[in-house]
Amino acid sequence: MEFKQHIKEVENWPKEGISFKDITSLMQNGPAYKQSVDALIDYARKQGADVIAGPEARGFVVGCPAAYAMEIGFVPVRKEGKLPRETVRVEYGLEYGKDVLTMHHDAIQPGQRVVILDDLLATGGTIEATIKMIEQLGGTVAGIGFLIELDGLGGREKLEGYDILSLIRYAD
């Protein structure tokens, strides 16, 4: 299936000059959503995933159904203050400032093979922070899968050395 046909592009949103790639149109089409998640599941299986990690919120949209189908755990990666127990945290840079991501301190066991799933790869900052926490806990990032990759924003280069699958790619 050609997944790109199910993505709606919204010009000048959330701000002028941005062409937003809206995955909700793909999610609203049952067969397209299922086939895209199935493609990420196939990838995670080939990578030997013991657990799936996904950044909030749209990483949950692809990561949770993948973990469920594979009968393995899902690790939510959340913004600071959203997880109730002890966490590890990584501060990372945004275009205008900084943010913090966290995961529970016992979410990844040493030696576990983790596949990170998310909706979109742009600059790679969120995924880079996620990788740091996984590796800090002793996990191995076995692969990273995305619905969409925006070429030309440096994300793939920032994640050099990691196996990456993108179902849809947009040139800059």
Curated annotation (Swiss-Prot):
It is found in: Cytoplasm. It comes from the Bacteria. The keyword Transmembrane does not apply. GO terms for cellular component: cytoplasm. It catalyses: AMP + diphosphate = 5-phospho-alpha-D-ribose 1-diphosphate + adenine. GO terms for molecular function: adenine binding; adenine phosphoribosyltransferase activity; AMP binding. Catalyzes a salvage reaction resulting in the formation of AMP, that is energically less costly than de novo synthesis. Belongs to the purine/pyrimidine phosphoribosyltransferase family. This is Adenine phosphoribosyltransferase. The lineage of its organism: Bacteria, Bacillati, Bacillota, Bacilli, Bacillales.
